[in-house]
């Protein structure tokens, strides 16, 4: 793709998201969503392979459906209240339709089926954008309309997302699909606490984006897309392999790494609100995620696949491209747990 066209598309993508995040009018938010979608689809087809075309088509169909539902909810709300303001969503039907539309855009269960397939069909860099930047716009709208969202509907979708995110990733060998199912589970944790403590959702989002960015950057450094290829990097880049292992365990929520902090704070907040069954279910289903991350860690750093003698440790390691953001991202992804007491006071 022409670099100039790519810059224009990325600028439009950023502007579309910023328009959604900063607008208080439904029409401007809808236009922002459409700008974002129409800029992202050509980026997905940067390498015009059949898989990329299929992924782009699936993404277009799901996002167009979600946008149609969103506009339908806005029109119903407009007919009942005469309001275009985002925060004034009073009609229950409009609120339910809006929640479903945003759940489709986020990839929450039971509308999650498109996320693994689309992520698998696109390159790692585009997958990183899909699983991080593309979550900002729908979550910002959910944050604004959180007082009028149906609690039971949101909790059911959140719990289903955590369950499906763990369940779906169990038998995967493709790293992009594993990251997609992990994204579904993390979205479930974020939306579960949204109605009780929206600020905690933002903290969880920040940590999730940092961990996902770190993970994808490590995959890009290693040029790996499968479990097998990841397990064969120890003799070329031992330091990168070790960091990959730590980040994987952090994404699974294993203490004392950063990924444990948002889970701990969310369970604590739900318990304060006299909810016991929901956080118990969330903690148990989070073990599914932790299991497949630990299995991935085990196959990456602690075992050797059957191989030839050429797989022995090399005397000279591959030189890696300098990425200034990666060390900072790794520190945030693994060492934030000591800040928990301070953050719990602030939140």
UniProtKB/Swiss-Prot annotation:
Location relative to the cell: Mitochondrion inner membrane
GO molecular function, one term: NADH dehydrogenase (ubiquinone) activity
Record-annotated membrane-spanning stretches: 1-21, 25-45, 59-79, 96-116, 122-142, 149-169, 178-198, 200-220, 237-257, 274-294, 325-345
Membrane topology of the entry: Multi-pass membrane protein
Alphabetized UniProt keyword annotations: Electron transport, Membrane, Mitochondrion, Mitochondrion inner membrane, NAD, Respiratory chain, Translocase, Transmembrane, Transmembrane helix, Transport, Ubiquinone
A Pfam family annotated for this UniProt entry: Proton_antipo_M
Catalytic activity entry: a ubiquinone + NADH + 5 H(+)(in) = a ubiquinol + NAD(+) + 4 H(+)(out)
Regions annotated as coiled coil: none
Enzyme Commission number, as recorded: 7.1.1.2
GO biological process, one term: mitochondrial electron transport, NADH to ubiquinone
InterPro entries linked: Complex_I_Subunit_2 (IPR050175), NADH_DH_su2_C (IPR010933), NADH_UbQ_OxRdtase_chain2 (IPR003917), ND/Mrp_TM (IPR001750)
GO cellular component: mitochondrial inner membrane
Family per record: Belongs to the complex I subunit 2 family.
Subunit structure: Core subunit of respiratory chain NADH dehydrogenase (Complex I) which is composed of 45 different subunits. Interacts with TMEM242.
Role description: Core subunit of the mitochondrial membrane respiratory chain NADH dehydrogenase (Complex I) which catalyzes electron transfer from NADH through the respiratory chain, using ubiquinone as an electron acceptor. Essential for the catalytic activity and assembly of complex I.
Name recorded for this polypeptide: NADH-ubiquinone oxidoreductase chain 2
Native source species: Balaenoptera physalus (Fin whale)
Gene expressing this chain: MT-ND2
